[in-house]
């Protein structure tokens, strides 16, 4: 028996299914343990199975726990289903019994009509059961009904059904009672005195509600139609209280179901029935009483008491009125108000307003518990934001195991933890948002029509700058490298109608995505230029997406229509596929066919642009008393003038001498110039101006804000610089630690270090964004330094120390830097078109990639005879089936489709001669290196590994 257990085999896939893990994981583990298995269908012995279960013990425990939880859940569900089924059966039986109780008397009477006569049962209510004091209590009790529990359950469960069939059943019973052959003695009811102040009500009274129908019983040949509860309805015993609570509970459960029936039609029906039911009856003498009506009718069940000494209209209450009153009572118990639709609407509106008020209050409370803080804030700053003392913050840090001082910077995780300890939620913002300057609201009298800001977008060489050149009547294209605009330019022009328009010329190629996005943020209208002899390019679609995301209207200009190969209709079709449907085709985008070289359609294009601007009603604040602000469009470093930035004014007037802050730098306006270099005294809204007076180079997209004094501007800039400096320091330290950990874990990653120097800040950002995209898991670009201006000796020394290359974009090194670079044998490259930079860097990174290995099949051989050679081993006599085998080929030995060897050929012979290759159709002899288990019928596959150059 023990031998059979040891010899028992287990399939890997079955073991994986039992452990609820991937069969590939089990197969990989078996291979690591030295098991000789080929696939998940392979078999393993008992020892290997125990090793597998030991390795995947956690998974086994999880599977067992999951199965236990699932079984327990199934048992609970089964128990609940059984209880629900039993409850449902009881309720169904009770409903059937109660339903038969209301229907069976009539059926029974029909069957027994020839034998047992119908008897009308009249019950007299004693005077002591109904008194004036009890009648007063009726007004105070919502539902003073004393019914047996099964009857109340039937009323609660079958309220709707009873309401619909009550009138018909009672009518049938009334007819049957009236047609009785046997005379029944009628006992007059005594008149019940009632107080004069008690009004006549349409709702069913206590006596009416005391009547209940039960299962019919034949007593002495008589059919009992109804019974009257003779117990006092005003009993204050515990049993009465318990029944009252149960009744209210049942009514509450049915309230939601009955609400759907409370509509205006019920109200109209009740009003109509009341109008038709109230009839004038003759007054009766005081000694007489009303004739008793059969049990089961509404009149006998709950007759309203009469007022003495007065003749008054008494409504003849019918079944519809009773049903409506019952529903109204139940509705009142559920606090649903009246049944009118107007009352319901007011009630719902009140509930909605209360919910909205609660939600707004909760939102305000949640906002009060959110602290907006910059990363690396100090305990003192954090304490001011949360309304606590710095001492409390430091003590909390000590309790958390962090020893800090009052001015020490805290990292992001520490700030979140401390805020959570004080009941706040930390929301991190940038240093500019934290120190944002409050802008005064614009006064309506200061708002005037301003010139529109137009951005020209499109693909490379589609004619954007040529269009602007024709409008400005100056040759701007001649100064651009390869006809490609290298950085954003802002220009103000005056068209024929003496109206001013500000143009932003953005680069069209993909590398300047961020610059184009900034152009879309400050622009009012976009002119999308597409060449008629080309097609809609990816950069064109990208420009469309930027404009749509910014909510900027688009005017399409189809350029180069003067060329013979121009096809404007094709461009319109492609634009419609991109979501831009022109007006000619029923869309909302204006379109104009132009020729920027010959000036065809330019005037019409300007008219459409101005018409779009008039529709938008573009206005700006032209007040000279407010502090102006604008957007930094572009910045550059001039050798003689220093930092020069192109600013697009948004509100107010920029004047010479104004102190300002822009991003992390500040300054004082020393000079203002237009795009042609002419000095001006001030600049208003939508006017581009070149500003001199910056202390440092600002970044494109920063907001320039005029401050009240130099001191305020300097303080604000210093606060931003401290936060930015701390952020950069922490980030560089974290990057170094992360890189060390990554290199230890994954091995050394190949990096191409470089230093970038360019003429403008926008060009640097575009280059950095483009270069950082060229990377994968093995190689990447590491920019160790970037700056504006010429290449200096410091840049060369940094490149030599970090083994980096230097890229100069439209800048050159000085004399000393050039000599030092030649001495250090550094690679310094100069470019004027950004495409060339990206292409060269991509090629360099591809060269750093390890080659990709591919297997190339050469041929296959079949072993037809095996020879035993002394001192060599087994040699296979093979027949070349296909392809070709070489002496240095790698081979794979297959037996019955299963690979059992993968290695190198040791010898390749034809007859007794060693050969280098054997073609198909020839016989040869082979021997395998370090392997001689060759059998007849084996297949030998020959292949080789080919290295292929990889691409990013």
Curated annotation (Swiss-Prot):
> What keywords is this UniProt entry annotated with?
Cytoplasm, GTP-binding, Initiation factor, Nucleotide-binding, Protein biosynthesis
Q: Does the keyword Repressor apply?
A: no
A molecular-function term among this protein's GO annotations: GTP binding
Q: Gene3D superfamilies this protein is in?
A: 1.10.10.2480, P-loop containing nucleotide triphosphate hydrolases, Translation factors, Translation initiation factor IF- 2, domain 3
* Segments of this protein annotated with the region G4: 559-562
Alphabetical GO CC annotations of the entry are: cytoplasm
Q: Which residues form the tr-type G domain?
A: 449-619
Identify the stretch annotated as signal peptide in this record: none
Region entry G3, spans: 505-508
Residue ranges of region G2?
A: 483-487
Q: Which InterPro entries match?
A: EF-G-like_DII, IF2_II, IF2_N, P-loop_NTPase, Small_GTP-bd, T_Tr_GTP-bd_dom, TF_IF2_bacterial-like, TIF_IF2
Q: Which Pfam families match?
A: EF-G_D2 (PF22042), GTP_EFTU (PF00009), IF-2 (PF11987), IF2_N (PF04760)
S-S pairs:
none
Q: Where this protein primarily resides, as one coarse class?
A: cytoplasm
Q: Which residues does the annotated region (Disordered) include?
A: 74-95, 153-204, 230-256, 273-319
- Output compositional bias ranges, type Low complexity: 153-168, 286-303
From the UniProt entry, list the residue stretches annotated as the region G1.
458-465
Q: Where is the composition biased (Basic and acidic residues)?
A: 232-242
NCBIfam families, per database record: IF-2, small_GTP
**Entry similarity comment:** Belongs to the TRAFAC class translation factor GTPase superfamily. Classic translation factor GTPase family. IF-2 subfamily.
Q: What's this protein's name?
A: Translation initiation factor IF-2
Naturally occurring in which organism (per UniProt): Chlorobium limicola (strain DSM 245 / NBRC 103803 / 6330)
Point out the gene that encodes the protein: infB
């Amino acid at each position: 028996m023990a031998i059979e257990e040891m010899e028992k085999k287990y399939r890997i896939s079955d073991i994986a299914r039992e452990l609820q893990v991937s069969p590939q994981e089990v197969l990989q583990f078996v291979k690591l343990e030295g098991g000789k298995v080929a696939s998940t269908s392979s078999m393993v012995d008992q020892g290997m199975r125990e090793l597998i279960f030991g390795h995947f013990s956690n998974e086994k425990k999880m599977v067992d726990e999951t199965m236990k939880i699932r079984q327990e859940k199934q048992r609970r569900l089964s128990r609940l289903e059984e209880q629900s089924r039993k409850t449902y059966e009881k309720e169904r039986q009770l409903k059937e019994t109660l339903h038969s109780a209301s229907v069976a008397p009539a059926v029974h009477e029909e069957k027994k009509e020839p034998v047992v006569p119908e008897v009308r049962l009249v019950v007299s209510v004693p005077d002591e059961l109904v008194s004036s004091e009890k009648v007063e209590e009726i007004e105070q009790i919502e539902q003073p009904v004393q019914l047996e529990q099964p009857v109340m359950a039937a009323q609660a469960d079958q309220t709707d059904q009873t309401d619909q069939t009550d009138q018909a059943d009672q009518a049938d019973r009334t007819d049957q009672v009236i047609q009785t052959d046997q005379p029944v003695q009628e006992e007059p009811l005594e008149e019940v005195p009632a107080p004069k102040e008690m009004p006549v009500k349409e709702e069913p009274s206590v006596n009416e509600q005391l009547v209940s129908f039960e299962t019919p019983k034949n007593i002495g040949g008589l059919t009992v139609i109804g019974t009257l509860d003779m117990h006092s309805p005003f009993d204050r015993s515990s049993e009465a209280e318990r029944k009252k609570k149960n009744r209210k509970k049942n009514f509450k459960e049915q309230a939601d179901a009955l609400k759907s029936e409370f509509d205006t039609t019920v109200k109209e029906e009740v009003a109509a029935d009341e109008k038709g039911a109230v009839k004038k009856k003759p007054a009766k003498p005081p000694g007489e009483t009303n004739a008793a009506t059969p049990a089961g009718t509404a009149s006998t069940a709950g007759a309203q008491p009469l007022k003495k000494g007065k003749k008054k209209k008494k409504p003849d209450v019918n079944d519809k009125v009773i049903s409506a009153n019952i529903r109204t009572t139940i509705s009142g118990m559920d606090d649903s108000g009246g049944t009118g639709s107007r009352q319901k609407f007011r009630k719902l509106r009140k509930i909605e307003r209360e919910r909205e008020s609660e939600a707004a209050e909760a939102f305000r409370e949640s906002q009060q518990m959110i602290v907006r803080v910059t990363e690396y804030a100090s305990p003192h700053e954090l304490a001011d934001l949360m309304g606590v003392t710095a001492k409390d913050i430091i003590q909390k840090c000590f309790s958390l195991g962090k020893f800090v001082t009052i001015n020490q910077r805290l990292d992001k995780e520490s700030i979140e933890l401390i805020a959570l300890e004080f009941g706040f939620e930390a929301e991190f913002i940038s240093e500019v948002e934290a120190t944002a300057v409050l802008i005064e609201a614009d006064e309506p009298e200061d708002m005037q029509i301003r010139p529109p800001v137009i951005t020209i977008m499109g693909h490379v060489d589609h004619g954007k700058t040529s269009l602007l050149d024709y409008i400005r009547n100056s040759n701007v294209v001649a100064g651009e490298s390869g006809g490609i605009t290298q950085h954003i330019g802002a220009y103000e022009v005056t068209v024929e109608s003496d109206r001013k328009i500000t143009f932003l010329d953005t680069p069209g190629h993909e590398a300047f995505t961020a610059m184009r996005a900034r152009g879309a943020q400050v622009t009012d209208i976009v002119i999308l230029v597409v060449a008629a002899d080309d097609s809609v390019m990816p950069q064109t679609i990208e420009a469309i997406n930027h404009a749509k995301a910014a909510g900027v209207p688009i005017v399409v200009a189809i350029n180069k229509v003067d060329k013979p190969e121009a096809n404007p209709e094709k461009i319109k079709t492609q634009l419609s596929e991109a979501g831009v449907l022109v007006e000619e085709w029923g869309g909302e985008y204006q379109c104009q066919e132009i020729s920027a070289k010959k000036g065809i359609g330019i005037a019409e294009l300007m008219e459409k642009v101005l018409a779009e601007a008039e529709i938008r009603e573009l206005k700006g604040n032209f007040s000279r008393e407010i502090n102006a602000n604008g957007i930094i469009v572009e910045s550059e470093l001039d050798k003689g003038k220093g930092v020069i930035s192109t600013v697009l004014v948004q509100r107010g007037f920029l004047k010479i001498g104004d102190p300002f802050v822009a991003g992390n730098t500040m300054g004082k306006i020393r000079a203002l110039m237009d795009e042609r270099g002419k000095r001006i005294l001030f600049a208003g809204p939508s006017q581009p101006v070149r500003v001199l007076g910056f202390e440092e180079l600002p970044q494109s997209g920063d907001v320039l804000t005029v401050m009240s004094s130099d001191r305020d501007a300097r303080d604000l800039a210093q606060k931003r610089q401290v936060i930015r400096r701390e952020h950069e320091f922490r980030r560089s330290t974290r990057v170094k630690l992360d890189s060390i950990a990554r290199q230890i874990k994954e091995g050394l990653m190949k990096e191409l270090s470089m230093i970038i120097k360019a003429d403008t800040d926008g060009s640097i950002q575009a280059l950095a964004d483009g270069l950082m995209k060229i990377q994968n898991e093995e190689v990447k670009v590491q920019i160790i330094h970037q700056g504006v201006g010429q290449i200096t000796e410091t840049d060369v020394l940094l490149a030599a120390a970090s083994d980096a290359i230097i890229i100069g974009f439209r800048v050159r090194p000085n004399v000393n830097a050039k000599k030092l670079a030649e001495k250090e044998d550094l690679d310094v490259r100069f470019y004027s078109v950004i495409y060339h930079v990206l292409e060269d860097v991509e090629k360099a990174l591809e060269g750093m990639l390890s080659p990709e290995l591919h297997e190339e099949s050469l041929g296959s051989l079949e072993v037809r005879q095996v020879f035993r050679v002394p001192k060599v081993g087994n040699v296979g006599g093979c027949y070349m089936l296909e392809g070709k085998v070489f002496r240095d080929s790698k081979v794979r030995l297959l037996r019955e489709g299963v690979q059992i060897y993968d290695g190198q050929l040791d010898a390749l012979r034809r007859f007794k001669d060693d050969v280098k290759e054997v073609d198909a159709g020839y016989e040869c002899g082979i021997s395998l290196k370090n392997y001689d288990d060759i059998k007849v019928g084996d297949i030998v596959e020959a292949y080789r590994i080919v290295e292929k150059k990889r691409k990013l």
